[in-house]
Amino acid sequence: MAAMPDNTHSTDSGRQRTQRRRARLFALRSPIPHSVSLSVTIGLFLSLFGLWALASYGEWVRPVFLPTPTGVLQRAVTLYQQEILVRDLWISNVRVFSGFLMAVVVAIPLGMLAGNMRIFSAAIDPFMGFLRYMPVPAFIPLLVLYAGIDELPKILLIFIGTVVQMTIMVGDVTRQVQADLIRAAMVLGANGREIFRKVIWKGSLPGIVDTLRINLGFAWTYLVVAELVAADEGMGFRILRSQRFMQTDTIFLYILLIGLLGIIFDFLFRRFHRWAFPWSQEGLRK
Amino acid sequence: MSAFRLEATDLTRTFESGSQAVVALQSMTLQVGAAQVVCLVGPSGCGKSTFLSLAAGLDEPTQGSLYIDGVAIEGPGADRGMVFQKDCLFPWLSVRDNVRFGLGLLETRRSHGASMRRLREHCDELLDRVGLWPFRDSYPSQLSGGMRQRAGIVRALATRPAVLLMDEPFGALDAQTREDMQILLLELCREQATTVIFVTHDVEEAVFLGDRVLVMKPRPGRVVADVAVNLPASRDRHTKLQQDFQAIRGEVLDHLYQVMSNAEPSG
Ligand SMILES: Nc1ncnc2c1ncn2[C@@H]1O[C@H](COP(=O)(O)OP(=O)(O)OP(=O)(O)O)[C@@H](O)[C@H]1O
Ligand SMILES: [Mg+2]
């Protein structure tokens, strides 16, 4: 890190102080000022946006490959007026969350059982390992065969895509509750059920919420695949169809919207985590 | 008073690891009276923690038995409390809820409203005694190591156990805090007439706290010496400077050196 030449008038110690402050920004696992953190985040988005604007308005790239920001915005307005945009957003959210919630309902109990009772881990762990490497899109023909072409196969595909990973992750999370805490509870007189409820479950919860946050992202990545199945609306469907008509602006719009949804859900999950588990926050002690 | 508070007869615990069998504890016989403090010292692997686990009811002996007031130990019970080397507080509970954890469990089992209220008050009193009252609503991660360990002790004492089992509880503390904790522990246990089994690596600590110091040796784990600490019951910082204290400390150290030198060649 070279010293910036902007403080020629300041004293030696002044420059040293700036240097030290700058070095601290790169210290391992140390907090940095909130303002710095925020400006780095916004700065990255803005510069990417700037690059996009430059390349598209400056016509470095042909418009059919790279639409302009205003082009994308216009497309958004058009699709909104045609009542397509909201409809697509709604139906895709319904699909993603239905599949995701199904996976949650299955994965949390399975993961908790696998993580805490050997007899269940003997059954569940190898089976999940067996399922884990299977390519999810390969299930589409079977799903269509079994579940038709309505909403069910699309939701099931998202379910299949997330449930395995989620079960494995919940199992790992609950295994991480320290054996020492379980021993402490036993000595205090807790029986098996109480240990499960008051120690293992409580101790796993923050990790489970984190697991859900990560897996919601996975669920969204399966959306496009799910909407390969005889869909006529939805964000994934719209992206695929726009390719056929070379509507790159629509593709951009929908990809960006999915990214935006990702940021929003992530934020909400983190907020919830901080609110629900104040005890597990890093840097609680200050 | 025929029965001892804590009694071990021919207590043996072997661990099968692969083809080998490790005798963690061999034919240990021990009698501890009410309100006595017994310290266990010995090199690593001599079965100190194994004994505590057995006494806590977390583990079962291969042979022999353990009794509390003449009743054989079968699993953990409210008559025994345990303090671990790591504080082992539940991170999601406030200090006060941690301390009341055992009470909460008791409450769901029986409904002695009046005695429960007394125990709750007792909890709060103890918190106050150890200086944690202002921190009762804090989470463990917000406390210092010494404060956490104090909370751990209060939690173990909350249900007024007859026997307190402690496995190197002060090992991770700095010297000053450690000494404060030793004095505090003696005070609290004397008030409640608690019997204490205290495991430590620190001979000075053992002599300071104990009415007796047991020296153990590994492979197989056995008690090789039972040193009586004939010092006045009330102990403070000056105790450690006394000649008697140093003499007993020397005696324990001699036993320890002997154990070490015997254990070394056999590997
Ligand atoms: N669960 C177990 N499985 C196999 N062997 C064990 C187990 N627990 C203890 N042992 C063995 O029993 C012996 C005694 O162990 P223990 O933990 O009681 O020693 P310790 O005196 O507490 O040692 P330290 O001072 O290091 O804590 C050791 O040789 C150890 O390897
Ligand atoms: Mg030990």
Predicted feature locations:
Chain B
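The feature captures the beta-strand-to-loop junction immediately N-terminal to the Walker
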Residues: V41-P43
